[in-house]
A protein has these predicted regions:
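N-terminal glycine-rich anion-binding loop in soluble enzyme alpha/beta folds
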Residues: 1-45
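Mixed-charge interfacial surface used for oligomerization/domain docking
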Residues: 1-12, 68-72, 76-81, 90-93, ...
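A short alpha-helix capping/helix-coil boundary motif
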Residues: 29-31, 58-59, 88-91, 135-138
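Alpha-helix boundary/capping residues
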Residues: 33-36, 57, 131
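Short catalytic-loop micro-motif centered on adjacent basic/acidic residues
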Residues: 41, 62, 94
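Active-site cofactor/cluster-binding pocket
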Residues: 45-80, 84-85
């Protein structure tokens, strides 16, 4: 759908960069990262990436991965301010998903439903805020290895969790 544009995160190693878009082969990435022994890192989209995605739209609904794990929300917030200052008649509804999982897709689908129903911009933003109060997904990580490799978890904690077969 041309109205839905992804602004991807990136996972990097000293050997390769993985861009989280439709061309990413997740199985290959997981296999390669599992065998990679070096340090990995993540990079959120920058303000320019968000501005490019906003394009020339009159209404933008920007959904970000949780601000507690990524700088995506902050970069999108700066882009929103720049966009609305440059184009005073355009609006950006910035949504911190407070999630790192499928909840982003649920929010997207709800926005599509509200747009299709003909709601105005402000109503949609308010409805999404209310909708988020009732959408909470819980998931479990099989391993903490990648989190340790990119500095988000102490490597000793990841090792102990693996030895004890603890899933978080």
């Amino acid at each position: 759908d041309k109205h839905i544009i992804s602004v991807p995160l990136k996972i990097t190693t000293d050997k390769k960069e993985y861009v989280d878009d439709e061309s990413l082969d997740i199985e290959v990435m997981i296999r390669e990262l599992a065998s990679y022994k070096g340090r990995s890192g993540t990079a959120c989209p920058g303000t320019g990436d968000w501005l490019d995605a906003f394009g020339d739209a009159d209404w933008v609904f920007a959904i970000t991965i949780t601000s507690t794990l990524s700088g995506s929300y902050n970069a999108a917030r700066v882009a929103k301010e720049e966009y609305e200052n440059e184009y005073p008649n355009r609006k950006v509804c910035l949504i911190d998903s407070l999630s790192a999982g499928a909840e982003l897709k649920l929010i997207q689908e709800k926005i599509e439903e509200l747009v299709a129903a003909g709601h105005d911009f402000d109503t949609i933003c308010n409805e999404i805020t209310e909708y988020q109060k009732h959408t909470h997904l819980i998931f479990c990580l099989k391993s903490l290895t990648n989190l340790a490799n990119n500095g988000r978890v102490n490597p000793a904690v990841a090792k102990i969790a693996g030895v004890l077969n603890i899933h978080v």
